[in-house]
């Protein structure tokens, strides 16, 4: 009877054997993400994680979920699937870092119409690499084969991250005040936002993936699939020595929509546009898309993937720590008093 049901399910478009083959493929590198606290192996009904609270007086769990968006389309176009998993981890982990949380574990959801074991293995390998960079465990996941739901050969991803922070050390921006300094940390490139506009511009220009980006040594293929940078090591090290008042992950909505999310109503962030190095891909997108820089900063990170807001007297120490970690960082602005009618982000060109 079980063989009949299995064949019927296969005829309906769901291959259980392919799912089992995937589990076999990924077990070794998923296990490499294990950290202290992991109690379960891959393949169970749930992932088990034991919290170590010896250094946390009032533990607060912080969670986030996200995807990779239409950046996946370039993975399909270029048939390269081993880096978008890093993007998936980065989008979730970077969000919980904003509140001072240390990532603990990650879960993924992979959905496709017909499971391609090799392709899915590459994706989950990337997720494992992202988890290792973030120093969190890949505790489990779901692979959903959904016949007819997706274009053949394509898939979608979702990620879920949980971290921990002591309640007394939550970073929420409430202490930000006039005179504080804004530091920008370099992005690795476009990261994972704005790709619908990127695709539109790319298609209009009919460029080839192996063309060199003007002003760069990199090809479009290399830059378009360069993984989102994971900031956990940097932030977890900085927090030990620096009083950080607020942090911002520059994602969809760019500077204008993300920075206000951590600012008190009485202040504005004055950003000096000329204060950091803008990677060549953004100049190319701005020119070919006939976009103003205001529009660019509303959509893209334009070279700044993460923002720190710190007291003025901590700036030298913070910049020295960042330099010792070989992190590209710039003082990009300051916190000022909000006047009537002011937007909360002012870009000074």
From Swiss-Prot:
SUPFAM superfamilies, A to Z: PurM C-terminal domain-like (SSF56042), PurM N-terminal domain-like (SSF55326)
Protein origin, superkingdom: Bacteria
Subcellular location: Cytoplasm
GO BP terms in the entry: 'de novo' IMP biosynthetic process; adenine biosynthetic process
EC number per UniProt: 6.3.3.1
Keyword Lyase part of the UniProt annotation: no
Pfam families: AIRS (PF00586), AIRS_C (PF02769)
Family listed: Belongs to the AIR synthase family.
Stated name of the protein: Phosphoribosylformylglycinamidine cyclo-ligase
Organism for this UniProt entry: Lawsonia intracellularis (strain PHE/MN1-00)
């Amino acid at each position: 009877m079980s063989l009949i049901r299995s064949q019927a399910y296969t005829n309906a478009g769901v291959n259980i054997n392919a799912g089992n083959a995937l589990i076999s493929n990924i077990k070794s590198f998923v296990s490499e993400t294990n950290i202290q606290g992991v109690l379960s192996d891959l393949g169970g009904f749930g992932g088990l994680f034991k919290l170590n609270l010896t250094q946390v007086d009032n533990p607060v769990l912080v969670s986030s979920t996200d995807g990779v968006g239409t950046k996946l389309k370039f993975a399909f176009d270029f048939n390269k699937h081993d880096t978008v998993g890093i993007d998936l981890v980065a989008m979730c982990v970077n969000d919980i870092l904003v509140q001072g949380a240390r990532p603990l574990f990650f879960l993924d959801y992979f959905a496709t119409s017909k499971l391609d074991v090799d392709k899915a293995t590459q994706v989950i390998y990337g997720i494992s690499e992202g988890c290792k960079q973030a120093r969190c465990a890949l505790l489990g996941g779901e692979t959903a084969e959904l016949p007819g739901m997706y274009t053949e050969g394509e898939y979608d991803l979702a990620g879920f991250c949980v971290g921990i922070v002591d309640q007394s050390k939550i970073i929420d921006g409430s202490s930000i005040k006039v005179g504080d300094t804004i530091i920008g940390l370099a992005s690795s490139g476009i990261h994972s936002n704005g790709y619908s506009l990127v695709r539109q511009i790319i298609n209009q220009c009919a460029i080839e993936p192996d063309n060199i980006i003007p002003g760069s040594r990199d090809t479009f293929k290399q830059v378009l699939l360069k993984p989102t940078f994971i900031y956990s090591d940097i932030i977890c090290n900085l927090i030990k020595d620096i009083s950080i008042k607020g942090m911002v992950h520059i994602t969809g909505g760019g500077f204008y929509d993300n920075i206000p999310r951590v600012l008190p109503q009485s202040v504005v962030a004055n950003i000096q546009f000329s204060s950091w190095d803008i990677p060549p891909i953004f100049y190319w997108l701005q020119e070919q898309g006939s976009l103003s820089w205001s529009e660019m900063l509303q959509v893209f990170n334009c070279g700044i993937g993460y923002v720190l807001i710190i007291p003025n007297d901590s700036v030298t120490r913070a910049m020295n720590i960042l330099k010792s970690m070989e992190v590209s960082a710039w003082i990009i602005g300051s916190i000022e008093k909000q006047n009537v009618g002011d937007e909360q982000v002012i870009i000074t060109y």
